[in-house]
Amino acid sequence: MAKGLGKGINALFNQVDLSEETVEEIKIADLRPNPYQPRKHFDDEALAELKESVLQHGILQPLIVRKSLKGYDIVAGERRFRAAKLAGLDTVPAIVRELSEALMREIALLENLQREDLSPLEEAQAYDSLLKHLDLTQEQLAKRLGKSRPHIANHLRLLTLPENIQQLIAEGTLSMGHGRTLLGLKNKNKLEPLVQKVIAEQLNVRQLEQLIQQLNQNVPRETKKKEPVKDAVLKERESYLQNYFGTTVNIKRQKKKGKIEIEFFSNEDLDRILELLSERES
């Protein structure tokens, strides 16, 4: 299955014969969502807009479904299904396909990853599911999805956060940048109060990075030595490296030289960073 990752969905959407013989009108009451759907939240405003489009133009692209014991499972097109329900339709156009459980899972994940904007946490869960069920490495998955290896790795790291913090990211209360930065806190007992401080004071990612650096060094904010103000170029380079390595990076410039500090918090984290460095060299 892993060998053909990505090809199944292209064949399903791009090579389907949309003649009258292949498209059926299926009752909405007989349809149920794909159990492997990674998307947990559907934007109400976006669905309302899609509903208006359905009312004016109908459903332009048929759903892909699979026959089940109690009706049909939606393989692809759950947003169209939900919009059709909101529009009060009784039936929707659909193409029935015979698909295995494994292929259903793959298609559900790939459709969302390729066609819609998942939340960072939903995207991470989709990557995790593909890695586990298709027996792929992060590098293999990145190549087949056309993503970078750091992009996959940085999303997956969110899943190591406590569930309540993952939920805050899923809701949009915290950003992915906040989540990745929180992973750098050494004393995990300080994690919960720190999260509450971020929310209460609406700290941005950069402010959180500075606060975590102080906490990790166990230096009170009031007595911390004031560091030289960095120019815009250094800040830009620093931000780029932090995004690439998924951890705190500090660039220090002196008179005729400088140094780059990359933080890691375990042997596994160090191996991850070294792997990213070796990829840049190859």
Curated annotation (Swiss-Prot):
Keywords, in A-Z order? Chromosome partition, Cytoplasm, DNA-binding, Sporulation
Q: Which GO terms describe its cellular component?
A: bacterial nucleoid; chromosome
Question: Under which name does UniProt file this protein?
Answer: Stage 0 sporulation protein J
DNA-binding positions are 139-158
Gene that specifies this protein? spo0J
Give a GO molecular function annotation for the protein.
DNA binding
One Pfam match, given by its short name, reads HTH_ParB
Q: Name the species this protein comes from.
A: Bacillus subtilis (strain 168)
Name the phenotypic consequences of knocking out this gene.
Increased number of chromosome origins, probably due to early DNA replication initiation. In a double soj-spo0J deletion DnaA transiently arrests for longer at its chromosomal binding sites, not just at oriC.
What the protein does comes down to: Required for the initiation of sporulation and for normal chromosome segregation. Antagonizes sporulation inhibition by Soj. It probably interacts with a specific DNA site and other proteins involved in partitioning and cell division, and antagonizes Soj in response to cell cycle events related to chromosome partitioning.
- According to its UniProt record, where is this protein mainly located? cytoplasm
**What biological-process terms (Gene Ontology) are attached?**
chromosome segregation; positive regulation of sporulation resulting in formation of a cellular spore; sporulation resulting in formation of a cellular spore
Coiled-coil boundaries:
none
InterPro entries listed in its UniProt record? Chromosome_partition/occlusion (IPR050336), HTH_ParB/Spo0J (IPR041468), ParB/RepB/Spo0J (IPR004437), ParB/Sulfiredoxin_dom (IPR003115), ParB/Sulfiredoxin_sf (IPR036086), ParB_dimer_C (IPR057240)
Keyword Cytoplasm in annotation:
yes
Has UniProt tagged this entry with the keyword S-adenosyl-L-methionine?
no
Write out the annotated subcellular location: Cytoplasm, Nucleoid
Q: Give the domain of life.
A: Bacteria
Q: Which family does it belong to?
A: Belongs to the ParB family.
Give the classification, highest ranks: Bacteria, Bacillati, Bacillota, Bacilli, Bacillales
